[in-house]
Each structure stands twice: as structure tokens, then as C-alpha cells.
Amino acid sequence: MKGYRNFIIIFSALFILYVIAELNKPKPVDWTVTISKNDKNPYGGYIIYNRLKDLFPGVQMRSYYLPVYNQLNNIREKNTAYMILTPSFDPSKYDYREMMNYVRQGNYVMVSAEDFGKAFLDSLKIKTNSRFSMQNKDSSKVNFVNPLLKLEKAFTFLSFTMTQYFSKLDTAKTTVLGVNDRDEPNFIKIAYGKGALLLHAAPICFSNYFMLFATNSMYTARALSYVPPGISKIYWDEYYKITNEPSSTPLRFFLKNENLRWALRLAMAGLIIYVL
């Protein structure tokens, strides 16, 4: 019995040391595109979220974690903005209807996504496309149409190619605001009622990494300048993002980490051997 006791003590000590080592091991960089307000990784949105109050002095910030319909169906305001910066945006028909009612009242919605839902695009009579190139490119360029905002040599971003663009537009209602390196529209404005819908096809332009590269923070600020500076509130979406929230329980933390998951299995096996 004493031998078993020594075994479990030694095994437990080794297990604890292993867990401590794993917890202190440097974490690999997460390159997932989230544009989430709490994400400080390269493609998170920590910087842009915390800069919004500088770009819109005095504005009230509110974060939402539910679909557009659930958030906007009770809002009857003017002069506010709803920002959805996400890799993919595919709202339901109810979300779309509520969003456009919100815009019609005199508000602005800005959606930046690389992938838009087909039903959403069809409702607006627009289409997107992704340019394929035989060349192995490791950088992209974006710029504005307005001479007062555009750079002579465009805004450049390394390590990420931005190939999505709007291939078909409803020209009666749409204004092209920005283009990619082939002068294909990737930033447009659709007037509706007393407000407008701003669609942007390169959400990476609002990421931490993009904004810290060269003068690219200037691009982000200028893109947001199409939202009226005197707005009273900004509703920031977190629902449509890919987030990496911390585990809510110790068990989930162990199960998410492969090494700790195996350590937990070994510990359980050791306890079973001890009991037997």
C-alpha cells in the first residue's frame, strides 16, 4: 500500500510540473481573421475598436452579440452607425429588412466582409468576385477614388492578398468609394432613404496588423470618414465574428489544449491503476 501511495505522489508531482510547464510555454501566434474588439492577435480588431472614439469624439460605443434583427428591431434613432467587420456576413431576410429600415431612418451601416451571403447580395442587386492570379503574390494594394483621400502609390499590405471585389453594381444607387490594385471596386456606398449602406470587401484593412503596417492606419481612418463625423452612437457587432473566447471552465481549458488533454488522460489512467 505504501508503494502505491509513493507512486501516486510522484505521479501527481510530475503531472503538476508538466501542467505548469505547458501553461508557461510561449503561445503560437494566432493568425485567424476575427476583427474582434478583444483580439490583440494580428488579425483581431483591438486597435480599430479602441481608436473609434478618437475618430468620432464624444460618440457612445455599444457592443452587440446577437443578430442584426434582434438588435435593431427596437431602435428608432437617427444619426447613428452600425459596424460589422467580419470575415463572412450572411444575414437572414429578417436581418436584412431590419437593417435597411434602420438605414432608411437616417443611419449608416458599414459592413466589411470577404464573403457576403448570396441572398444579401441579390437583394441589393450586386455581385462579388475573387480574382485569381497565376502569379505568386504576397502583397496587395488598395486605394480610394476621391482625389482628396487617395494616395499616389496606393496603400500596400504585405503577407495578405485582398482579391475580393464587387463585379456587378446597381449603378442607380451605388457610388464607388475604393478600389484594389486593378481598379476593381472593393468599397461602395449604397444610398437608401436618409442614410446609407457602406460595403467593403477587405475586412483585413481593419485588423491590428494592417493598421500597424506603414501608413495604413491612414487608410482605415479615411475609409471610416464616410461615416458622418457627428454620429451620436456606434453599434459594434461581435455576433458575426469568428472569436476565440477563453474557456469558461477549467475542464474546457484542458480539453482545448492537445498536450494538456493527453496529460489529463495519463493522470486519469494513473488514478485507475492506483485504485485497482
Where are these regions (language model features)?
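Membrane-proximal, cysteine-centered motifs at transmembrane boundaries in secretory-pathway
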Residues: 199, 204-225
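Long alpha-helical segments found as membrane-embedded helices
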Residues: 1-56, 60, 72-91, 95-100, ...
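Short, solvent-exposed loop/turn segments at secondary-structure junctions
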Residues: 116-117, 204-205, 241
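Juxtamembrane amphipathic/hinge helix adjacent to a transmembrane helix
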Residues: 64, 221-254
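Flexible, charged surface loops at secondary-structure boundaries
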Residues: 73-79, 103-104, 168-172, 191-193, ...
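Catalytic beta-strand/loop cores that center a nucleophilic Ser/Cys/Thr
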Residues: 143-201
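Membrane-embedded segments
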Residues: 61-145
